[in-house]
Amino acid sequence: MDTKSLLVAAALQVVEQQGEAGFSTRAVCAIANVTAPTLYHHFGSADGLLSAAITEAFAQFLMSKKAEAFSADPVVALRQGWDNYVRFAAERPRLYAAMVVRVLQGATIPAAIAGRALLVERIAAIEADGHLAMDVEAAADLIWSSAHAASTLYVLAPERQPDPIVVTTLRERAVQSICSPIGSEKPA
């Protein structure tokens, strides 16, 4: 692994263990076994390194979504993708929180944009099957916001896992909201 990749991996480790608030170049340098000038040579600043680490986290997240085998049934595949999203946040709550903060700060992250496109693709497959009850973009907003809400439960209280019934209910209500009952027509 080259020095730049080593620093990004070390930064991810620090964010996962300490959160963005606990991020320090000293901790990253200790893990990567480099000096501060090496870090600044590659990234210019602590924020430059943190941005690179968050970009890598989004790339890892997108890779996990693309690598997972999904059902041929588009509604089942949507549920599986939703579960994958929430599982990532549950397993890596501090990193997920840092990722969301970067997006809220207006960062343009290609893997985040690609992740949204993947969600829209999955919902378009539901529309192609004739089971979408609303516009594809509106449905994507609803599904993403429900997955984000469930994920936030893991971030806000990492020591106390949310009740699985709450998480499942969030998913099912969102999916039911965007899907037309079988045999019905999409509203005009």
Give the role of each language-model region.
Residues 3-6, 10, 14-48, 52:
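Helix-turn-helix
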Residues 14, 64, 88, 122:
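Short alpha-helical functional segments enriched in proximate histidine and acidic residues
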Residues 15, 49-57, 99, 108, ...:
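Alpha-helical DNA-contacting segments of helix-turn-helix folds
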Residues 53, 57, 61, 65, ...:
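Hydrophobic recognition helices of helix-based DNA-binding modules
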Residues 66-94, 139, 143:
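Hydrophobic alpha-helical connector segments
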Residues 95-98, 104:
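Hydrophobic, amphipathic alpha-helical faces that serve as interaction scaffolds
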Residues 101, 108-109, 113-116, 126-176, ...:
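Hydrophobic/aromatic-rich alpha-helical bundle segments in the mid-to-C-terminal region
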